[in-house]
């Protein structure tokens, strides 16, 4: 092969600042930080490969500390790494996890064999644009192409691999060779349905596209409830995790329901000491007949249901009256599950407090919306 992929991703550098050998090498080579130490190693590998008539290809982490002179970057943490490579005159291959990791579920998780997580339906693959419109023509030529990835920890057979690949690979192929202006998903979907049947006739095992369930119910349209747009405050030691903010302080009252994966920027994640402690200011005393929130569980990445949920109300924001306390036995399994923890009844209050804590397994808590409605029903 002309190219040798050397990886270079997810190098744990936590111990490098205190490692005597690392520090000695940094001093000898005049390197100012551990990122430059990794870059030094990548440069050495490239010199070796080039001397043997090969070219270096690596994940976008090889940008850290300075890119090797002739390296090609495979961008998996979004497209930003690829754009940085192109801007510096290097070739790039676009392979962002959001669009190109085919080990994610492609339909409702409870209808699919166990996967690593995530949700990447055919339509989302097709929506990928690997070349931003703002990129100049000379830089476009440096985008070498796109690549799908299928990691097989949860894929035990070739038949299962075929199901994960087809028909999503057909969508990525059209992404690669089509101008975005001529793409039409409805037209592609009709052709993909026919291609799936043709693949079956040839003995392949593609995903059953004609029976696709689609996104999680409620996730495609905003909902209305009493708390939409109200002010939300987070208790001490109970802030959301910055990497899973879902848009910030208003995320849990924005009327937007999360989909099948916590990575869709709609689920807010909590891993602080007290996990989740949220208070909603309804601005005035309000009749409330139900309060509820959905949580998800995906054991592989340590996302678990809460072990306890407390819903309480107040008129002064200081003294709260408990409406309901729910204890839940968290059980590990291989499924992606969704559970609503809610209260129904009659109450009048200005402030609504929703607390959720983790059990013995720890991990993240994820919820998408705290729904308050003024009639006796719960979502």
Language-model regions, residue ranges each:
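Predominantly extracellular/luminal regions of secreted and cell-surface proteins
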Residues: 221-257
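Hydrophobic, well-ordered secondary-structure elements that form the walls
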Residues: 6, 49, 73, 169, ...
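Short proline/glycine- and polar residue-rich coil/turn motifs
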Residues: 329-335
């Amino acid at each position: 092969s002309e190219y040798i992929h050397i990886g270079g991703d997810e190098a744990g550098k936590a111990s490098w600042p205190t490692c005597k050998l690392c520090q000695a090498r940094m001093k000898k080579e005049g390197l100012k930080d551990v990122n430059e130490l990794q870059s030094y190693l990548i440069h050495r590998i490239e010199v070796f490969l080039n001397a043997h008539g090969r070219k270096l290809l690596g994940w976008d982490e090889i940008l850290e500390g300075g890119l090797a002179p002739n390296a090609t970057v495979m961008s998996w943490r979004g497209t930003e790494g690829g754009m940085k490579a192109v801007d510096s005159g290097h070739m790039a291959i676009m392979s962002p996890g959001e669009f190109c990791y085919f080990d994610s579920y492609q339909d409702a998780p409870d209808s699919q064999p166990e996967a690593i997580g995530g949700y990447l339906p055919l339509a989302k693959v097709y929506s990928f644009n690997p070349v931003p419109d703002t990129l100049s023509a000379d830089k476009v030529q440096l985008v070498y192409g796109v690549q799908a990835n299928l990691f097989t920890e949860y894929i035990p057979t070739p038949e299962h691999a075929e199901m994960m690949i087809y028909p999503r690979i057909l969508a990525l192929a059209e992404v690669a060779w089509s101008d975005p202006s001529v793409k039409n998903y409805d037209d592609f979907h009709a052709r993909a349905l026919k291609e799936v049947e043709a693949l079956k006739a040839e003995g392949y095992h593609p995903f059953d596209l004609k029976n696709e369930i689609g996104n999680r119910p409620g996730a495609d349209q905003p909902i209305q409830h009493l708390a939409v747009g109200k002010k939300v405050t987070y208790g001490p030691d109970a802030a959301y995790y910055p990497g899973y903010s879902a848009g910030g302080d208003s995320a849990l009252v924005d009327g937007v329901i999360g989909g099948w994966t916590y990575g869709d920027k709609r689920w807010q994640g909590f891993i602080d000491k007290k996990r989740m402690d949220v208070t909603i200011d309804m601005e005035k005393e309000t009749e409330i007949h139900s309060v509820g929130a959905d949580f998800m569980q995906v054991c592989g990445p340590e996302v678990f249901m809460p072990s306890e949920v407390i819903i309480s109300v107040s008129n002064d924001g200081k003294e709260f009256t408990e409406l309901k306390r729910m204890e839940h036995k968290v059980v590990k399994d291989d499924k992606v599950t969704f559970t609503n923890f809610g209260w129904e009844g009659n109450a009048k209050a200005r402030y609504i407090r929703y607390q959720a804590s983790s059990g013995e397994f720890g991990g993240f808590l994820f919820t998408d919306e705290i729904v308050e409605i003024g009639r006796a029903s719960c979502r």
